Amino acid sequence: CNVLRDDGVTYHQYLNELTYILFLKLSEVKGFEEHIPEQYRWRSFVEETDNTESFQRYRSFLAEVSNETTSAGIKEIYANASTSLRKPVNFNTLVQAIDDLDWYEETDRDVMGDIYESLLEKNAGEKKSGAGQYFTPRPLINIMVELMSPKLGERWNDPAAGTFGFMISADEYLRTKYDNYFDLSEKDRKFQIEKAFSGVELVGDAHRLALMNARLHGMESEIILGDTLTEMGKGLNGFDGVLANPPFGTKKGGERPTRDDFTYPTSNKQLNFLQHIYRSLKKDGKARAAVVLPDNVLFEDGDGQKIRRDLMDKCNLHTILRLPTGIFYAAGVKTNVLFFTRGTTETENTPGVWFYDMRTNVPNYGKRTPFTRTAFNDFIEAYTGGVKPDSLTTAFDGTINENARKKVDNERWQYITRATIAKKNDSLDLGLIADDSISNGDDLGDPIEIAKEALSELESITLQLQAMIKELG
């Protein structure tokens, strides 16, 4: 990676490059090289001693393979592919380094998957790449997965998949519990690898990275390149679970979605994703979702209020986690996680909502104070009704125990009835405690950072106002 950085290659370009080259190696390991023309197969690059000749052949491969292959997967990976490398020696360095790994050893495969994920995170932090919007912090992903507690045989989906982090974490959760699926029947193992997890991603580059990320983690999931908020999204339903962090911002130009099945179509993308998600769950009283959403979803009037009311009718919206600011690469965005279970009926499924305030009087997360799993410890105990964080994956099966929750003594944790929420115009912008009611408020933030945050919020409000003005016409 450092060699390529010296060649002026950004993490974003490097990831694409690594994806193109890794897939060639994987095609050899997995035995589907017949879909790649012989002169472009992995061994031909490894055994070529002339760096310039090897690099020229690689460039030809990228230009031609999408037209020459019959494999849909290969077409997806190499769609509109081109190289960012300038020096032939750097291509050869990558090829040799990848070939030196023992790909038939599970530990080396896991290492490659971990390396790829760490590059995705570095890419997200590189502001000029704009990739931060596709990246959810790993500790948050893992906690959401563990609290949702996926089961074998269930179908899970991410309608805004990014680089597929939620589904990969859910798969790893089950592999850890069930000995990497080794004890499953061939039929059940095939289901877990191919059908249990799926996703949709709108952006071509992110979709390519998602496909590669899944393959490196031993998954052969369907990841569709498309827009969930268009007609194709209507067919995404009947899921046992959804995990998602829909992209921030309004739909471009204030446009409404092209879905005719939404009861409340709006120009607010997150509200549309929320509608899609609760409609995509099985109506069995067990299907569940955990979704990252910005504050405006909690308080927006008009269609926003109607969608929240519809959500609380169709689902048991049992928990809202008010997340700290500064944990996403999009500066100043205030976010929450909504946890809900689809009811078997269409009305009155939410008796009340538990709120946990992880935002008020907490450290400013950043380089000096990294955001880690331990930040969630008190929330985990509240959510589960007393399960210790270290035993979450073994002692918690996802069941919400209301009686145990009521016994939790934590001033950040409070229950608000559905009737009270209704009196507040169905606003869910609740559950934040007064700043001075918690003693450890010694880090209230850098004034410059706070000013930047305020500017960011003003920009967001301006965009929404412009969208509304356009709608009103």
What is each PLM-predicted segment?
Residues 1-152, 222-233, 322-325, 350-359, ...:
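Non-catalytic, mostly N-terminal accessory regions of nucleic-acid modification and defense proteins
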Residues 130-244, 249-251, 258-260, 267, ...:
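Conserved S-adenosyl-L-methionine
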Residues 238-240, 333-339, 369-375:
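Short, surface-exposed amphipathic charged segments that create phosphate/polyanion-binding patches used
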Residues 14-16, 202-207, 267-340:
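Conserved Class I SAM-dependent methyltransferase catalytic core
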Residues 195, 234, 256-262, 322-323, ...:
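Short beta-alpha connecting loops at secondary-structure transitions
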Residues 95, 190, 218-223, 253-257, ...:
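Short acidic (Asp/Glu) and glycine-rich catalytic loops that position anionic groups and cofactors
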Residues 232-234, 249-252, 299-302, 329-332, ...:
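Switch/connector loops and helix/strand junctions flanking conserved nucleotide-binding motifs
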Residues 238, 242, 333-334, 349-352, ...:
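A generic structural signal for well-ordered coil/turn residues at beta-strand boundaries
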